[in-house]
């Protein structure tokens, strides 16, 4: 508790690293229960703290990532394929991503959303986000069992927007996408297959 002096305003202000500051905030203000030596919901809390810290310090909070005007070659081919590739159906977000990259001539990359995210998405720093990167989570509670088991994946199309298959093909702001899908394992991005688009 804050009474023992560990989780006070002053200890928060004196914190020199993000992990300590996040823990102090969770324990001192949100009054979270401790689970395994960390505040409850730690993975989601710390992932979101990293996202906002990176966004604030890089000056890209709100409408983050590379703009579409800066995209070239295969990046634009992926954006065009996003706009023309139909939905394979509800709960088939990763299949849509696979179909988009195949249609764009980049390659064929299979797996569930959680597989793609775990293999290729390792950043949540908005400064790293480029047009054509996949964006997703390995697990989230918002869509019930499918989301918890398989996560969700979409494609960053520039200007702070992510397209994905949610039954219909949707376009959301990165902030909206993170607000919904970031409540579990957190949202990360990277190049599918490790193939940097140029």
What is the meaning of each model-derived region?
Residues 1-4, 29-33, 53-60, 82-86, ...:
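Sec/Tat-exported extracytoplasmic proteins
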Residues 2-73, 183-198:
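Non-catalytic cell-wall polysaccharide-engagement segments
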Residues 13, 107-177, 184-186:
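...with weaker cross-activation on analogous glycine-rich loops/strands in unrelated enzymes
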Residues 23-27, 47-50, 95, 133, ...:
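A generic structural signal for well-ordered alpha-helical surface patches
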Residues 25, 88, 92, 116, ...:
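Acidic, low-complexity intrinsically disordered regions
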Residues 35, 54, 62-73, 79, ...:
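Aromatic- and glycine-rich peptidoglycan recognition patches
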Residues 57-111, 118-119, 130, 145-152:
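N-terminal capping segments
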């Amino acid at each position: 508790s804050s009474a023992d002096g560990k989780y006070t305003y002053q200890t928060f202000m004196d914190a020199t690293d993000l992990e300590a500051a996040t823990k102090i905030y969770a324990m001192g203000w949100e009054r979270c229960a401790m689970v395994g030596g960390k505040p409850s919901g730690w993975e989601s809390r710390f992932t979101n703290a990293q996202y906002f810290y990176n966004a604030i310090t890089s000056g890209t909070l709100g409408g983050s990532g590379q703009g579409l005007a800066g995209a070239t070659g295969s990046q634009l081919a992926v954006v065009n394929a996003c706009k023309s590739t139909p939905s394979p159906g509800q709960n088939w977000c990763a299949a849509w991503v696979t179909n988009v990259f195949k249609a764009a001539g980049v390659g064929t990359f299979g797996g569930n959303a959680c597989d793609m995210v775990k293999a290729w998405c390792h950043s949540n720093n908005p400064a790293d986000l480029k047009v054509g990167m996949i964006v997703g989570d390995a697990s989230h509670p918002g869509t019930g069992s499918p989301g918890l088991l398989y996560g969700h994946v979409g494609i960053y199309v520039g200007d702070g927007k992510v397209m994905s298959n949610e039954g219909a093909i949707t376009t959301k702001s990165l902030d909206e996408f993170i607000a919904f899908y970031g409540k579990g394992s957190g949202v990360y991005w990277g190049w599918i297959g490790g193939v940097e688009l140029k």
